Amino acid sequence: MAQFFKAKPNSSKQLSAKQSFSVHQLDHLGAGIAQHQGKVVFIPGALPSETVQAQLTEQKKNYARAKLIKVETPSAERVTPLCPHYQSCGGCDLQHMSLAGQREHKSAALVDIMAKFAGAEGNSVPALTGEGWHYRRRARLATLFDKNTKQLSLGFRASSSNQVVPIDSCLVLAKPLSDLIAPFAKLLNQLAAKSSLGHLELIDADNGHFAVIRITKSLNDKDMAKLAQFAEQHQIHICLQDNNGEFHGVNGTLLLPVYQLLDDKADATPVSLTFTPGNFVQVNAQINKAMVAQALDWLAPQPGERILDLFCGMGNFSLPLAKLGAEVIGVEGVPEMVSQARENAAANGLSNLTFYHGDLSADLSCEPWMGKIDKLLLDPARAGAFESLQWLKKMKPRQVVYVSCNPASLARDSAVLLERGYKLQKLGLIDMFPQTHHIEAMALFELAK
């Protein structure tokens, strides 16, 4: 049979052409969704109900991606981003949408993902919301040393890039920390070791403000004196982290950051949690308190109950649960955080609380310390708790509270719980990161009788 040459469409011309798109919704990553020639097109920066001009940047079999060029018909939810670094910084990717619009989108996306991938429809509860700006109590800034100008800049990574975007302030960082960025940049440029400095971590704790400077070689006495003087002038605790991961206070003493929980409850004394810079801590203090309070309300811990807290970290949920009378078993995969959790329990005088280091993907049901479990709290990383749920079916806790930072893994894991006889009773958004697309959630499951 004769073979005839047939020219393929000029894909490069299709990609370079600017076209008009009608956006009808957002995906769970905050990108606008449009239809074009039978394909779904994802357009970051576009909002529902908008007509936009965009340029195709990627063509796949079933979808395409495009770069927003111009908004022709703006949405009523579109606002002018307040941050001068918005276009280049990779952090706050929904600043162009009103705060109310962001929360409405996130709540709807959460319900949609759970219904679509888990077949679960829970009793939606009001979202946990707080301040839209200056809510972060912790941030890590990258350093960029220019070999030509011999100048060091502080900033955040650009979107989908390792490039550092220099900044002098941050509107989602706690105001006292944001105000320290420019002075710190000036200070670090005065150090002889500025070319060997790593990241700068800023922390706003209940016992003061903290800064951690990553160093790759020891600082001389003059540099140390400058840091100590800056710390005194700005009333901030500065420590250095060396190549071995050890921390050293610039004034000779090392003070660790602390935050409190239950300090707003009239019927309970507060618990204090100390944490080491570098270890995980929820960055939104206001929402973390609300999240812990909601988990306590849903689980209603009682004396005599045994509650298992998986992925317990340094005790963010474990200590408050134990404070209200339940016997709590906390399991964590990071040894350093288990040690910190044990120290926190001892410092708060809690004896009804034990912590264990364990591989959370392995079967822990046969461990001698496990025993009968009445209720379960899960707070996994983005990957979820799929492996853990495989052995938890043997435990059959009456209630499961699942705290999630990824709705996709929550939906997948929810399907497992539903198959095992649990019913989704409550589902709610946790708006931990306003101005960004990130969706966090809490779900309550109860074993069907």
Swiss-Prot record:
Cross-referenced CDD domains: AdoMet_MTases (cd02440)
Q: Where does [4Fe-4S] cluster bind?
A: 83, 89, 92, 170
Which reaction equations make up its catalytic activity? uridine(1939) in 23S rRNA + S-adenosyl-L-methionine = 5-methyluridine(1939) in 23S rRNA + S-adenosyl-L-homocysteine + H(+)
Instruction: Tell me the residue numbers annotated for binding S-adenosyl-L-methionine.
Output: 282, 311, 316, 332, 359, 379
The entry's function note states: Catalyzes the formation of 5-methyl-uridine at position 1939 (m5U1939) in 23S rRNA.
Protein family = Belongs to the class I-like SAM-binding methyltransferase superfamily. RNA M5U methyltransferase family. RlmD subfamily.
Name under which the protein is recorded: 23S rRNA (uracil(1939)-C(5))-methyltransferase RlmD
Look up and give the organism this protein is from: Shewanella sp. (strain MR-7)
Q: Which gene encodes it?
A: rlmD
